Structure formats: C-alpha cells, structure tokens
Amino acid sequence: MADYQEYRRRILHRRWRRMFIIVALLALVALLSAIGILWKVLHRERVDTALSQNTILRQVTTDNTWNTVNYPLARQLRVQTLEDSTETALDFRMAALPASAPVEKSWFAQVSFVGDSLTQGMQIYDTGLPGAQFCAYKGVGPNAFVNGTSCKRADGVTEIPLDALTAQQPKAVYVLLGSNVLGRDTDYTSFLTYYRLMLDMISQALPDAKIYVQSITPVRPEVGTQANHAGLNRDRLCRINNELAAIALEKNCYFLNLWEVLADENGDLIESYAQPDGYHIKPEGYAAWVDYLCSHTME
C-alpha cells in the first residue's frame, strides 16, 4: 500500500506539474499576443505621425499626394512608387519651385553660389553670373564644407568655405554639389548625410538667407559607361535628385530643377550644351541656366 501511495503521489505530482506548465505556456502566449497587439497599435500611430512630416521615403498616402512644401506649386506633388517596394520617393520634378516673375541679373549681386567646377563656370563665363558672389572649388563635395577643409578658388586663393560664405553675408545662397563625389557607383548615404549637415550649417551661419538647392545637373548618356563615372547615369541621378528635393523641403529650402532647361527629352544633358567630357557645360548652357534662375525666385 505504501508503494501504491508513493506511486500515486508521483503520478499526481507529474500531472499537476504538466498542468502548471500548460497553464504557464497559455498565459505566456496570451501575454505575447497582447504585447503584439499593443505594438501594432503604437507602430501604426508612429507611421501616421511620420506621414504628416517631411520624410524621404514614405508609405503611399490615400490620395497619392504630398503637400508639405513651404511654397506654392504649379501642381500637386506626387510620389513615385519604388520598384519591388511598397515605399515611395518624392519626384524631384514635382517638388521644384514654380516659375515666377523674372528678376534682373543685377539681383544676384547679393547672392552667393556654393559649388564645385560646374559653379565655377557660372563665375567665369560671361553668360553666367560673374557679378554674383561665389564659394566654388574644383573637385569638392558637401563633406569638404562640413569638415572645414581648406579649398582653392578658381583664382588660386585658399579659404574655408563656410567662413568665406559667412563673410559674404548674402541674402540668398544657391547650392550645387555632388557630381564630383557621385561618380563612383557606390552607396550615396554619406553624401546625403553631409548634404543635410551642410544645409544646417548654412542656415545657422546665415539665418536670414534663403537657401536654394539646385538639382544635380544631367549628363550625356556615355558618361555613365566610363569606369570612373559609373555613378553618373540618368536613373541614378534622378534617384539622388529625389532625395535632395526631399531634403530641401525638410530643411525649409527651395528646390530648383535644372533639368527643365539643361536636359533633352530623354533626360540627358542637351548635346549642344555639353563639353567634350559630357558633364561640364558650355557657355550657351549657362545662358539657359541663368534664364531659369532669373525666373525661379521667391522674390
């Protein structure tokens, strides 16, 4: 009898232990389910909040529009659906500042241009804006601006870009950087990060100045086939310009779509505007560029 009682005690103990484990598992499943439901609710709230802010990549909105720009547009902003993705990117062509009453070239006497050799052309050619102020340096990107690198101007003088720009005290700043650092077909995340930081630094140094972000200019189709310029192809430049347009809106800057006047029907740099290298621009191209700038201001 004692053996039976011991055996029964062991069986009951095992049964109760098994039942305890089952109950504990059920409780754990219920807890995890509750946590999952709570996470979904909170996550949905964060997504909804994000959709009300300026973001570079965003879920499709109910009417497929994006109306967060700080200036009037000729048409509603639409977004592009990214291939094999539910996310979308802002179309830089739709985010551009619309045409305005043209200003005289003399208006740019109180304006500064920040850029690389493409901007130096604006300074050097008579068809550009030689009467404006410039912080233009061959071969630079936004990282040189952020890091306070000493840069050499077209006349050979070396200076720190932000210091030089601040000393000019312009009423507006026009920025065009990217062609020199995007030639390699690599990830451009760091370029965008530096670009954001650069705009922040300009805004802090010149709080009253309006900032115009110019799109990276188009190139001839053969440029992207060259090993040292594989990243300068039409499709990639469009994606980067989408990002720059979103950054401009995020930073309360104005975005200018230079492709309106420099690109042909295929989205390539107009052949008659192209220098032999396929991405630098001839004087007649600068004339069209200047006409566009004169008719796209916030004055």
What are these regions (language model features)?
Residues L176, Q214-S215:
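Alpha/beta-hydrolase-fold catalytic nucleophile elbow
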Residues M1-Q110, T119, Q123-I124:
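N-terminal secretory targeting modules
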